[in-house]
Amino acid sequence: MSYNNGGGGGGGGYRNDRDDRYHNNDRQNYRSSDQGRSGYNDDRRDNRYDDRRGSNNDRGCYDQHDRRGSSNDDRRGYRGYNQGGGGYQQQYSQDARYGSNQRNDNYGNNRGSHGGANMYSQNGGNRGGGGGRVGGGRTAAGMSNPGDLVGGADQPIHSVSKKSLRHNAQEFAVRPKTMVQDKGLGQKTTLLTNHTLVQLPQEPITLHVFNIEVFINGKSSNKRELCGPRFWEILKENKPTFGMPNQYIFNDVNMMWSTNKLRQSEGRTNNRRMNFVWKYVKQIKFGGNIEDEETMQLLSTLIDAIATQRARLPLAPPKYTVFKRLTYLICEEAYEPELPDVSLCHKLRIGTDARVGVSIAIRTNLRAGITACFDLGHTLFTRPAYPLVRLLCDIIEHSVVLDEAFEMKYDAALRACNVSDENLRVMTQILTKMTLQLSTETGDYVGEDGEVIVRPAPTIRNPGRNFKFVGLGAPADRYYFTSDGVELTVADYYLQKYNIRLRYPNLPCVLKKAPEQCGNKHSAMPLELVSYIVVPTRYGGFTMPDMRADMINKTTYTAQQRGKLLQHIIAQKSLSGIEPPVSNNDDYMKKHKLVMKREPIRVKATILPPPTLVYGDSVFHDEHHIGEWEAVTHDPPRQVLDGAVFRRKLYKSSEQPLMKRLMGSILLIQSPRQCRDFDYNQQGYHAIMRAIEDSGQPVLWADENKHSAVIQGELQFNQNQHGIEVIEQFLQNIKSTIGEYERDGEVIVPIVFAVFQARATVYSGNNNEYNDYNVLKYLADNKYGIHTQGILEKSLGVVGPSPKNCALTRLMVEKVLGKVGTTHRKLERGGAHKTWTIFTDPAKPTLVLGIDVSHPSTRDRETGNVLQKMSAATVVGNIDLDVTEFRASSRIQDTGVECLIDFSKEIDERIGEFIDHTGKRPAHIVVYRDGLSEGDFQKYLFEERVCIEERCLKIDTSFQPSITYIVVTKRHHTQFFLEDPSQGYESQGYNVLPGTLIEDAVTTNKYYDFFLSTQIGNEGCFRPTHYYVLHDTWTGKPDSFWPTVTHALTYNFCRSTTTVALPAPVLYAHLAAKRAKETLDGINTYKSVNNIYCDLESFGDLCEVNKDMNVNEKLEGMTFV
């Protein structure tokens, strides 16, 4: 396998005209049918990658509470229709190697003027440019020689149609002829959805399409909450050009539709401060029978814009407001009379309210037809006319202060208090960049009779004087200024000017910027007369600790509440006296003859039979579909599998198996922000070790009665006082003294319990403080090969003597058993679950792969070190015939790249380990792939499928296992609700039962896909997982095979004694990829502290990093759990 790091050429050059950059993809040395020399070029405009990315056709990004666009997500750069500008073009070059499409996501790393080429990346480019540490443009020793640039005189670029590209010519797996819902398998039921049918006009309506670019203060903007109001304001100012505004539809970003064609095909409005540029695109027919796939995909944006246009119009007073892709309800009453148990507005701290918003995703490719998928979200808004005095009380109390509490407790206290510097700092953070209002009719002050008057919020017609917050000043009775030559305090001024005697003159003044004629001075206003503005505005500023958790708790609807509210919205009923967000009776819907059904779509569903779980001494069958069982808390505790306590040996090994015995050590890690020593709860440690022993895994004890487990070593570490070498010495001592405890026929497995005084993520990244957790994981798991388990000091302190009363003990036991490779359970083979018996047939074994890529957070991309800015691709695969024990391998790759750069090596490792442990080649390879949207399917399926086929043929030309490729995603908005709540459990919040399968109506008509709900819990409404079976060559299996096998895999996650939302291989891939990212940070910290230079342009350094980020090969078990 060779790499090419040159600026453009050689073998496998791929040109991506999105950024006019050359990408070198000589990953697989694959020769196409065109004499082995065809490559391809794809200029589709793939937006910046977001690790929350879902299937939204507007930008290819997903936000759970942030989408109103279609979920078709083809994202092929049709800017001429739904993004503005551009088009779709594909080219290919004559080249010796196949070049795979590479997304060039530029997060501002500035690795050179052409994106920067690195050995971990497919992006080529010229060396140069600023910012990034890693540059490109040169070829490292041992890598492919640079060749001629693709598209040069000797290698001209020829246009080729999209359908001619090999990855677009492949066919997807076909849905089975008979669906499970039509078979006798499982229990049948009917569910409600959050979809409703959409009917287009029977006679097509002619619409004219325009691209729009809105400029605010000379800068182009694409923020919905800004562009929408400005667009309509400009439109009204230019009636001679545009006529009446009600003839236009605007998507609040960049597209406008009109029934009338403008006299000018393009132009610009003449307001210098705010204007927009329009350009005519084309004429379309809206309605009738539309069968063209491309038109159907683009149609969703228009339907969404028409349906929500009325709600998105700026009104005074506002009824709805737009933020990103949700339309938020601005209502005075928190409840709708028809929904007395569903709150539309929740009061939170610091004068904020969490208001509900509605999003609509138009789906045009479903089996039911065109549908509108409604969803809900919440965000923070300022409370109308909320006095700053009350804000100060919220800050002091850390909760919402009610009127009664204010009058009884805070009124007298505030008159005598001095505001602390910390509270002033927090208040300044909250108010920064906020628009406030000053009004003598608002705030808390004393009336003429001396009684405390809490004025109601002023009306919209008398909102007070608005101003921009600058800062906080001295108290009103000590803030002096000169007026007409007389020195006054602010308190004296308001007494003389407005006859207001301040009740709290001791509180700080609020400052605003004074008019220019007053110089650079500030105007000061008493805190008690200042409030938030009357109109609720979205709040995006500083939030108090735990406010996020508080908001989630208060805004989480139960399944029944969410279902009722969505059905109310779909029925187009008013909410708290405000018109529904979508209505067939509004003028825009009538004009375009668009109709939405007023009832949700009902779907058939099947509750699949569960598998049977096998423990060492017992079995469990979830016959009532509860999705939860007892293991550690079972009486007696369920034992690990027979033989699981012995060290796993290779198939060909003749060594006698040794029994594993755990021996613990304690590492106390202090927070660098605290100086106090801390003592850990030794009884908690011993209780955990006792629970591990009771589950069947032997532990080394200090006494015969097994009351006290051996503590091999103990260390207290503080990064401000000790160097990393102290931890290294501690780990070395553990390894060197293991022999003192070993017995015949046994092997000591050391494990370090790291007790953290505070979460490392709280303090890492500030004041040169690093993440202790990441450093420890790198040193222990990877460098020295010692198991670790982290726990917070406060959590260890509450561990009880019995795991029956302590959920934390149960979790710790399951995690430790998984990490050290002691298998606690497996799924029964040969029982009633026939498809699982086929899946785990020893004669035709199955290798299951889970694939995921962990990307850097926004903070890491902006401020992280060079390794923190990279992505980590991980592949996990089972090493046993029961598909229970998994191992992982990871590779570093460029930021935001979703395709696996070095997938061939990952496949080699996973197949190799499977063969080493089972002695058999897999007859079937099943891939569960996460992180893809529908627009990615063709490309990534082709690349990864071909790679697997090639690696198998390289092992042996006769080695041709079946390959199944399944994409897994929860990034969608579809939800299901019980039509009859009595079919659910109160303990599960009346959600659909785990194991519920949906195959029809809201699934696609293009792919073999299905929804499967397997998660359990008692809060919120669970979102089902969407599965796409894109490729499947496994023959001779029943039609119900993949839904039932996938369901069974959700019982196989070793950390939990409940079913989980995703199959175990996918969750393991998530965890392993996350651990790899954390390890990269640990590696960087270790190298920085030890002054070890790492250059990712160096092939040797890159290989070293890839080796260091993987777990020590001598360490057995699923360390990533």
UniProtKB/Swiss-Prot annotation:
Alphabetized UniProt keyword annotations: Cytoplasm, Repressor, RNA-mediated gene silencing, Translation regulation
Protein localization: Cytoplasm
Pfam families hit by this protein: PAZ, Piwi
Principal place of residence: cytoplasm
CDD domains referenced in this protein's UniProt entry, alphabetically: PAZ_argonaute_like, Piwi_ago-like
GO BP: regulation of translation; regulatory ncRNA-mediated post-transcriptional gene silencing; siRNA processing
Polar residues compositional bias, start-end: 99-112
Compositional bias annotation for Gly residues: 1-14, 125-134
One Gene Ontology molecular-function label: DEAD/H-box RNA helicase binding
Tissues with expression: Highly expressed in the germline in hermaphrodites.
Signal peptide (residue range): none
Domain Piwi: 774-1081
Keyword flag Oxidoreductase: no
InterPro entries with a match to the protein in the record: PAZ_dom, PAZ_dom_sf, Piwi, Piwi_ago-like, RNaseH-like_sf, RNaseH_sf
Coiled coil (residue ranges): none
Residue segments, region Disordered: 1-134
Domain PAZ residues, every copy: 426-534
Gene Ontology CC: cytoplasm; cytoplasmic ribonucleoprotein granule; nucleus; RISC complex
Biased composition (Basic and acidic residues): 15-29, 40-77
Subunit: Interacts with rde-12. Interacts with rde-10.
Family assignment from sequence similarity: Belongs to the argonaute family. Piwi subfamily.
Function statement: Argonaute protein required for gene silencing in the endogenous RNA interference (RNAi) pathway. Involved in the 26G RNAi pathway and associates with both unmethylated and methylated 26G small interfering RNAs (26G-siRNAs), which are a class of 26 nucleotide siRNAs that possess a guanine residue at the 5'-end. Associated 26G-siRNAs are methylated by the methyltransferase henn-1, which stabilizes the siRNAs. Association with 26G-siRNAs is required for the biogenesis of secondary 22G-siRNAs (a class of 22 nucleotide siRNAs that possess a triphosphorylated guanine residue at the 5'-end).
Protein name: Piwi-like protein ergo-1
Upper lineage: Eukaryota, Metazoa, Ecdysozoa, Nematoda, Chromadorea
Gene this protein is translated from: ergo-1
